[in-house]
Amino acid sequence: MSPLKAVAVLTGADVKGVVQFT
């Protein structure tokens, strides 16, 4: 997995978690 893709996945999970938390 490329670093950029890893960052995108982590960021996506982060955003999804924040949306669900809110």
Curated annotation (Swiss-Prot):
Could you give the cofactor binding note from the entry? Binds 1 copper ion per subunit.
UniProt note on tissues of expression: Dominant isozyme in roots.
Keyword list, A-Z: Antioxidant, Copper, Cytoplasm, Metal-binding, Oxidoreductase, Zinc
Please indicate which superkingdom the organism of origin belongs to. Answer: Eukaryota
Main localization (coarse)? cytoplasm
Quote the subcellular location field of this record: Cytoplasm
| Reaction equation(s) it catalyzes | 2 superoxide + 2 H(+) = H2O2 + O2
- Keyword Ion transport among UniProt keywords: no
**Annotated signal sequence range:** none
Q: Which GO terms describe its cellular component?
A: cytoplasm
Q: What is its EC number?
A: 1.15.1.1
* Primary enzyme class: oxidoreductase
Instruction: Please tell me whether the keyword Oxidoreductase is annotated for this protein.
Output: yes
Mind listing the GO molecular function terms for this protein? metal ion binding; superoxide dismutase activity
Q: How does this chain assemble?
A: Homodimer.
Family designation: Belongs to the Cu-Zn superoxide dismutase family.
What's this protein's function? Destroys radicals which are normally produced within the cells and which are toxic to biological systems.
Q: What's the protein here called?
A: Superoxide dismutase [Cu-Zn] 2
Species this protein is from: Picea abies
Taxonomic lineage from the root: Eukaryota, Viridiplantae, Streptophyta, Embryophyta, Tracheophyta
